[in-house]
């Protein structure tokens, strides 16, 4: 993408925590830690949601902003380091629930189907599946940063999900 969040993520590198809106140097404040982690993005090819559906709607604006502020408030209480990954995974789940994004049936169904494949592959102890903020997509992430997902595990997951009709792309946190 080319939105502000994408640009800031690229400029901060690694895993960012945006403390204040805006970009660094223009009022924004971002913390980050570096890690290199392979991951998968998964989506339903026939489903599309445009960001404007959410950011142009007052109800969505309010619920997303409130949920995000609560999560950031909890995350900023301690130093932002590699060891905070489990906290980030917890807050990403909390955000999806509190914002109402997880209440949309198409998202809930996608998350459920991907989680079922992870269980079938017996990789639930190694993987977190998290909704992407907008659109109908999920990220498949390592449960622990000191135990990156292996190429074979990523290939097995990708093959299983493609066989079920999902779009899958391998990418990474850098």
Model-derived features: where do they sit?
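Gly/Ser-rich oxyanion-binding loop with an adjacent helix/lid
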Residues: 1-27
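Solvent-exposed alpha-helices and their adjacent loops that cap or buttress functional pockets
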Residues: 2, 8-10, 30-36, 121-123, ...
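Glycine-rich, charge-dense phosphate/pyrophosphate-binding loop(s)
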Residues: 81-174
